[in-house]
C-alpha cells in the first residue's frame, strides 16, 4: 500500500493533542485553526524562507520569531504559536521523522565552531524543555546591553544565526526576553541549571576591570516554585524572608527583578509595608537611618532607576538596594509587641529541643522588638526556653546548679540528653505490654494459690471425716473390740458377706441426709457443670436456641439472618476490643406474642445470647429450682372496650388535671399559703434601703379616690394592719395609693405609686436572671417538672425600721378610727429594688438545697421556681425536699398555682413538655385578639407583643419589615394593604408556631444563616440522632451601612449579628455556622474597601473564635428555605462578586495612559476678611482650561470634587489623564463612589453623606471620556517635572479664581489726631529700694507675668532703675506664680472672629468652681471679644433661665443689645429659652464647634485666668471663699494689658487702670498733671491707636525652640489632675538626663515631656532631712523628705 508524504504541518495536525500539551506546559494557549493559518498563509509572507508546509529548521524559526517579536510592527497574537514551533524544533517529539531530527541537529550546529575552526561537540538534547517566561507578552524594560566579550585569539566570527539569538545589541530581537537553546558546552556561557539574573559572560575587558555581566530574567517556573513552596508572608514571614535574603546575595537580582519578586510573592498590603519599612532603614552618611527624602529616593527609589550593572557605581547602587530591601523585609515581618504570643510557643511532645529553640527565637523576632541573639536578651530567652519546654526537660533544667551561668548552648546540650533518653513509641508500647503481662501473671498466680488452698481444705476435710471412726486428735489406733472377728478387705461390715462394702450393702437402709450444701456432701455435683438456662425463640421463622445471659447488656446472634444495619458497636473482651455490626429489626415469636428487636452479630460467640435488653422487653422472670433454672414470660389477657360511636370523642378529650393532690396539702401544711397564712423569711436580716447623697424627702398628695374604690381596698388594708404588715406612722415622705380594679370582678387591690421614692434611692445592679436564656440551662433529658409560685413573696422579707418611713402613704378610715399615715414593715411591691433583693435572698436560702439535691435541676426567676428531673421518682423526691426547705425557711407557696410532678407545665409564659418549649394558647390568643393598629404607639405595642414570640416565628424580621417605618412618631401614619398583609402574616405564623427544643449544653449547636433584602435570618439547631431539631428562629435587620454591601459581605454581617443573639442560648458552646457563602475565606482576607478596620476587627473577634467553625457553603439550608418574596440568587464565587462590585468604571486606571494629554485639577478654599472664599481650576502645562469661583462657604473637598467633575465633562469622548492632589476626590472616583452608591448615599447613622450631589455628578461624569486615568499626585511640590509644575499652576489658578469676583476697596486710616499742646508728663525718679518695693507690692496685687508687669509699670509716671531685671527677678521668685501658672505653649496663633467695637460680640460660658460657696457652684463668664472686658457672675445652677436673667439684667442695661453671642453647645445655651430670647432681641447666637474648646478660645482662656487668679488669692489669704475673692480677680482681668499694650478698661472707658490713677503708691507727693489731662490723653490714644490696632489681623508667631533644661537644673512638674483651687505644679525636682523632647528627673520613674516642665524659682530648698524614732531604743531613722508645701 502506498503512503502519502508527511510534512511538518501535517505531522503537528495529526498529533495535535501532543502539540497542545506542549503548549500547555509552556503556559500558552493555541488554536488548531490559527496554527494552520499562520503556518500556511501568514509566515510564508515574511520572506525569510518559511515554506507553507512548515519546517523544523531553527534558523528559519528564529527569523520568523524576530519578526513576530518586533517592538514596532510585531505580531503579539502569533507569539504563542512561534514559541511552540521553536520548542518542537529544540526538543523534537518521537513522532518527528529521523531526517527531520537530523535537519534540526544540523541547523543547531550551523555556525557553532570552536576557536580553532573545528566543529564543536554535537548538541545533546535537554532532559526537560525550558519554559519561557510568562512575561514574554509584556514589553521588556530597557535593560543596558551587556558589553561584548573580549577578543579571543583565532576566534571565528559567530554565525549570523547566533548573532540574531541575542548576543548582539542590534536587530529586531534587541531588548527581548526570548529564551534560545543554551549551548551544552561550558565555554560559551554559564551553567544553565542556576537561574542567575546577572551572569558573568567572560573575563574582564581590562586587566583590572569588572567582569561583564549579562542579564537573564527569572523564569516563570522559578517564581511559581517559590510561590507554591513557601507559606504566605502574613502567616509565616520567616520562609519568604530567608528565601529573598538568599536570593539577594546569591542571584544578584536587578531592580526590576526585585519588583517582580515583590509582585509575585507578596500581596499589595504586604508589599507596601515592606517598601515603607525599607525606606525607614536607608542609611545616611553617618551610618544611621536617615530622614532626608533625597537620600532615601536616591538609595531606594520607587520608580525604575537608570542603573548599569556593568559599572562600579551601578553595582554599588544595586548592592545597597538589596541590603535595604532585606532590612525592610525583616522590619515588615516584625509584629506589634505581644509577649503573650511568645508564651504560647510550647515544646511539642516529640519536638527536638533545637527545633523548639528556633521556633522560640523566631517568635521573639516577630512579636517583640528585641533581638534574641543579642547578649542582653539571652537571659530572657533562656528563661523562656526553660519555662516552656516539655515537663521532663523543664524539670531537668530547673535542677541545674548555677543556672544563671549556663549559656543557651549548655541548656540545649542538657535538653538533648533528656530528649534522646526518652523512650520511643515502640519501646513504650513494649514496656506497657510487659507490665500488662506481668500483672496478669501475678493475678493468675494469686488465683492458683487461692484455689490450691481451697482444694487442700476440701481434701483435708474429706480425710478428716473418714478418720473419725478410729483416729481422733492424733490419738493412737484403737484396738478392735473383743468378741468381734476382724473383717477382710472385701467383706461387708453390715451383712458380713463378701463382694461389697457396708455403704454399698443392699440390705442396709439409707439414712435421711441433711440438706446442707457442703463440698463433701453426697448430694453435691462436685466438678459437674451446672445446667445452662436455654430457651428457644423463633427469629424470622427460624427456631433459634438462646442462652439466657443476664450479664450481657445486648442480645447476640451468631449469624445475621437477614439485612444488616449501619450501626456499629465496640465490644471490649478479655482478648481486646473489636467493632461488631447490628441487624435491622428482626421479628420474634414467643408463644402468642410477636416483638421486633435488633441483635448484635458476633460470629465468635459460642451460642446466641438472650441479654437484658430483650429480657426486659419480654418482661421475663427467671426461677431457680432443683430441676434447673426456668424462664417464663408475662402473658396478660387482652382487654377491649365496647362503647357507642357517639361517645368516642370522650377518648380524645384532654383530662383536666386537678390543681393539686390533697396528699401534698396534708404532708406539708405549713408551706401552703392557704393554710399557714403570710410567710416570713426567718434567716434573712431586715432590708436597709440606701438613699442617694443628695436625696431629700418628697411628699406627694393622695389622689382623689371614689367611694367604690375605697371600699374595695379597705379589706386589704385592714388585713395588712391585722397581720402587722402595715403600721401607723408619721413621716416626711408620702406617696399616693392607687386602687386597681381586678378584671371581671368588683374587687380592687391597692397599688402604691413609688416612682418619686425610686428616683431618690440608690441603684443596685440587677441580678435577676434573663428569662430569654434562663431555660437554656434546663437539660432536655429532664422531662418531669414541678412549678411553685411563692405567695406574697416580697412580704416575706422584713424592712428595717429606719427604712420604713420612706414608703409611707396617706389613709383615712373614719369607721375604724384610722386617720393619718401608714407604712410597710415588709418589703413593698412597686419598689424598684424589691425583685433583686428578694431574688438574692431566696437564692442564698436555697443554696443548700441545690448542693444536697444534684439529681434535680432548679430554676429560679424571682418568686417562680421550677424543679426538673429525668424521672417521676426523682421529681417527686426533689419536690418534697423543696417544700420541706421552704417551710423551714418561712416562705409560703400558692396551692392554686402549684403544678407538681407533671410532664407538661407552664412556666414564665412557656409550655414545657417532653424537653421542648411551646407557646401557650393564651399567648397566641393575646396576639390574635389585637385589633388593627391606628397609631404608631399601637404598632409598637403589637410588634413588642409579637416580638416575645419571635423565636417561634421563622423570619420574623422579614415579616415585620413593612411595619417598622410606621413606628416613628413624626412620620405620617398611613395604613396600606402591604401593612395589613404583614399584620396578617405575623398572626398566621403565630398560629403555626412549632415546638422548639430546649438547648442541650452538652451538644454542639449548628446555626444556619441566610440574608435576604437586608434582613439576617437564621435557624439555631441541635442534632437528635440523624435529624436536626430547631432550638430558635432568629432574624434581625442589618444596619444601613451593612445593607449597602455586596451579598457576600452582608452574609458576614448577618452571621455576626445572629451569632451574638445565639450566644444568649448557647452559653458559650461550640457553634457550626452554615451559610451559602464561603465566609471563612472572606473573614480571614477581608476586602479593605468596603468596611472600616474597627468593624472588621469586631467581626473577626466574633467569627474567628475557637468555638465557632464554618461548614462548606450550602446553597440550600433551613435558613435559605425560610419564606421570602422571591429567591433568584445564583450560585457564585464570593471573591469574584467582591471584585466586580468595587470599581465605578471597569477601565478606569490610576496610572497615566501613554500618549494621552494631561490635565491638572485643584480646588482652593480659604478665609479672607472673615469669609470663606473658594475656587476651582483645570490647567494643562500651557494654559488654563477652566477656572471659576465657587459660592461662599464651599469647602476644599467640595471644590476638589467640582474641579474633577468639570474636567471629566470637558473631556467627553476624549482620552485624557487627569491629575489631582486630593485624596478625597481620588478615593471617591476609584473606590468610595461605588460603595456610596451601594449604600444609597447614606452614612452609618442612616443620614445623607456630605457632598451628595457632587458625588452623584462625579459618578455620572466618569463615564463621559472615551479613556480616562485619574492619577493622584502629591501637592505643593517644588520639583521641575511636569506633574509638580502642573499641580502648582492649578493651585495658583484656583486661588485666583476664588478672588476673581471680589471687589477690593482701598481704605485709608484717618490721619487726623489730637496733638497735645502742653508737653509730656515728666517721670518721677525712684530709688532702687523704692522701685523694688513698688514692683513687689504691684506683683502681689496682680500676680502678672514679667511682660505684662513691665507694660503696666511703663505706663506709670515712675522711673525705676534696672526695671527689667527687677521685674523678672521678682516674678521668677514668686512661689505662688511658680506652682500655678502654665507653661507657654508654642503654637501658631490663629484667626478668630471679633467685633469691630465694644459690646457688639460677646462670648459666654459656664465654668464650675469647687468647692461651692453659699450654694454657688458655677461661674457665668461674659467677655467682650473687642476690648477683652469680662463680666462674671456666681450662680447656683447651670440653666438657660440663669443665662437669660444675666443678659437682661446685667449686659443689656450696661452695654446695649449685642449683635452676636458665641457659646459652646451646652444645654443652657441651646435651650429654647435662650434661643428664643436671642431671636426676640435680634441677637445672632453662634454655637461653636462641639468638642472643640479652641473655638471658644477667648472665654475659655478667661475662665482659666479667673481660676488661676482665684487660686493665687486663696493661697495668699489662706481661705477658700472664692465668691468673696471674685471682685479682685475681675479687677486683675480688666486691668491686664492685652495684645496691643492696652487694658480692657482703657479700651472701654478711655482712661488708665484704676490701680494707677493715684500717685500715692510710693508715699510721697509730687507735681502731677490733673486727672483731666490724663483723660484727654487717653481719649487721644483711643482715637488714634487703640481701635485700629485691635482690628488688625493676628500675625504668625515664631517657631518653637528646644527646651532649655540641662542636667542639674531644678524644675517643677505639671500636675495632670489638679483641682479647681489647687496648684498646677509640683516639685522642685533635680534633672538627671535630657533628650531633645523629654527629661529624666530624680523622684519620678517615668520620663517627663519637656512641655510639662518649667524652671523652679530660686529660694526654698527642694528637700530636708528628718529624724524619726523607731521601735529599737538605740536606733534612729534618718528620712529625706521632699518639700512640696506649695505644691
UniProtKB/Swiss-Prot annotation:
Q: What else is noted? A: Reverse transcriptase/ribonuclease H: The reverse transcriptase is an error-prone enzyme that lacks a proof-reading function. High mutations rate is a direct consequence of this characteristic. RT also displays frequent template switching leading to high recombination rate. Recombination mostly occurs between homologous regions of the two copackaged RNA genomes. If these two RNA molecules derive from different viral strains, reverse transcription will give rise to highly recombinated proviral DNAs.
Tell me the residue numbers annotated for binding Mg(2+) 3.
Answer: 1405, 1464
Q: Where is this motif: PPXY motif?
A: 140-143
The way its activity is modulated is described as: Protease: Most efficiently inhibited by Amprenavir, which is able to block Gag-Pol processing in infected cells.
Q: Where are the zinc fingers (CCHC-type)?
A: 490-507
GO CC terms, sorted: host cell late endosome membrane; host cell plasma membrane; host multivesicular body; membrane; viral nucleocapsid
Which protein are we looking at? Gag-Pol polyprotein
Occurrences of domain Integrase catalytic (ranges): 1394-1552
The free-text domain note is: Gag polyprotein: Late-budding domains (L domains) are short sequence motifs essential for viral particle budding. They recruit proteins of the host ESCRT machinery (Endosomal Sorting Complex Required for Transport) or ESCRT-associated proteins. RNA-binding phosphoprotein p12 contains one L domain: a PPXY motif which potentially interacts with the WW domain 3 of NEDD4 E3 ubiquitin ligase. Matrix protein p15 contains one L domain: a PTAP/PSAP motif, which potentially interacts with the UEV domain of TSG101. The reverse transcriptase/ribonuclease H (RT) is structured in five subdomains: finger, palm, thumb, connection and RNase H. Within the palm subdomain, the 'primer grip' region is thought to be involved in the positioning of the primer terminus for accommodating the incoming nucleotide. The RNase H domain stabilizes the association of RT with primer-template.
The residues listed in the UniProt record as binding Mg(2+) 1, with positions renumbered to this chain, are 789, 863-864
| Record-annotated active site | 549
According to its UniProt entry, the protein's GO biological process terms are: DNA integration; DNA recombination; establishment of integrated proviral latency; proteolysis; symbiont entry into host cell; viral genome integration into host DNA; virion assembly
Q: Which cofactors? A: Mg(2+)
The record, for InterPro entries, names:
Aspartic_peptidase_AS (IPR001969), DNA/RNA_pol_sf (IPR043502), G_retro_matrix (IPR000840), G_retro_matrix_sf (IPR036946), Gag_P30 (IPR003036), Integrase_cat-core (IPR001584), MLVIN_C (IPR040643), Peptidase_A2_cat (IPR001995)
Which intervals hold domain Peptidase A2?
A: 544-614
> What Pfam families does the record tag this protein with?
Gag_MA (PF01140), Gag_p30 (PF02093), MLVIN_C (PF18697), RNase_H (PF00075), RT_RNaseH_2 (PF17919), rve (PF00665), RVP (PF00077), RVT_1 (PF00078)
What gene is behind this protein? pro-pol
Record's catalysed reaction(s): DNA(n) + a 2'-deoxyribonucleoside 5'-triphosphate = DNA(n+1) + diphosphate; Endonucleolytic cleavage to 5'-phosphomonoester
How and how many cofactors are bound, per the record note? The RT polymerase active site binds 2 magnesium ions. Binds 1 magnesium ion for ribonuclease H (RNase H) activity.
Task: Give the matching PROSITE patterns.
Answer: ASP_PROT_RETROV, ASP_PROTEASE, INTEGRASE, RNASE_H_1, RT_POL, ZF_CCHC
Q: What biological function has been recorded for the protein in this entry? A: Protease: The aspartyl protease mediates proteolytic cleavages of Gag and Gag-Pol polyproteins during or shortly after the release of the virion from the plasma membrane. Cleavages take place as an ordered, step-wise cascade to yield mature proteins. This process is called maturation. Displays maximal activity during the budding process just prior to particle release from the cell. Reverse transcriptase/ribonuclease H: RT is a multifunctional enzyme that converts the viral dimeric RNA genome into dsDNA in the cytoplasm, shortly after virus entry into the cell. This enzyme displays a DNA polymerase activity that can copy either DNA or RNA templates, and a ribonuclease H (RNase H) activity that cleaves the RNA strand of RNA-DNA heteroduplexes in a partially processive 3' to 5' endonucleasic mode. Conversion of viral genomic RNA into dsDNA requires many steps. A tRNA binds to the primer-binding site (PBS) situated at the 5' end of the viral RNA.
Source organism of this protein record: Koala retrovirus
The segment(s) forming the RNase H type-1 domain are 1153-1299
Coiled-coil ranges (or none): 408-453
Residue ranges covered by zinc fingers (HHCC-type): 1339-1377
- Kindly list the residues the record flags as site (Cleavage): 128-129, 196-197, 455-456, 517-518, 1310-1311
Biased composition regions of type Pro residues, renumbered to the chain? 139-153
